[in-house]
């Protein structure tokens, strides 16, 4: 699983920017409202020019982190998840008659997760790796030509709000 995600990242950071449409790319930050907060950063590159029939597709590469502290009588435990992934995002704005600033979308990709549990001093931390499908659907609202608000539902972070900076 790690090899697939590494290949996806290499593809996204080398090949995708070469075919990305200027002015339709973005970087952003997000905050998942589930699990007491999931922080994330992402980059998204429009590849519609290289798609058959110019389909409105972009590639999203992201990192998300969730961390929680649990105090106990024996000490404090900290649990954290790091998720790295890539997804193909389809823009449905041309399929619906909406305000041009509203952009509904859905996406599917892969995510690799690393979880770590550390305990009181003297106990070694434990960690595990996993991964799987990443599913996302949401809507973006262009507040200005350079900034968009994002609201989505995904399977890592749940209901998520964010800000995207277009370039």
Regions found by a protein language model. Give the residues of each.
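Cleavable N-terminal export/targeting peptides
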Residues: 1-24
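Glycine- and aromatic-enriched membrane insertion/assembly motifs of diderm outer-membrane
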Residues: 22-95, 148-150, 154, 160
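Mid-chain, well-packed structural core segment of small domains
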Residues: 92-120, 125-130
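Mature soluble domains of exported/periplasmic/lumenal proteins and thiol-rich metal-chelating peptides
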Residues: 111-115, 138, 152
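Catalytic phosphate/metal-binding cores of nucleic-acid and nucleotide-processing enzymes, i.e., regions
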Residues: 135-137, 141, 145
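Outer-membrane beta-barrel "beta-signal"
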Residues: 157-167
């Amino acid at each position: 699983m790690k090899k697939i995600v590494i290949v996806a990242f290499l593809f996204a950071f080398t090949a995708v920017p070469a075919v990305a449409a200027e002015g339709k790319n973005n970087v952003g930050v997000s905050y998942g409202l589930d699990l007491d907060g999931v922080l994330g950063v992402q980059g998204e590159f429009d590849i519609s020019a290289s798609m058959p029939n110019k389909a409105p597709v972009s590639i999203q590469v992201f990192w998300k982190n969730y961390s929680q502290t649990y105090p106990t009588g024996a000490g404090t435990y900290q649990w954290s998840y790091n998720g790295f992934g890539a997804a193909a995002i389809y823009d449905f704005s041309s399929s619906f008659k909406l305000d041009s600033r509203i952009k509904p979308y859905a996406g599917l990709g892969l995510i690799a997760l690393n979880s770590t549990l550390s305990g009181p001093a003297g106990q070694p931390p434990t960690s595990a790796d996993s991964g799987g499908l990443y599913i996302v659907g949401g809507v973006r609202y262009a507040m200005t030509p350079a900034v968009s608000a994002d609201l989505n539902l995904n399977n890592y972070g749940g209901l998520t709000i964010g800000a995207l900076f277009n370039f």
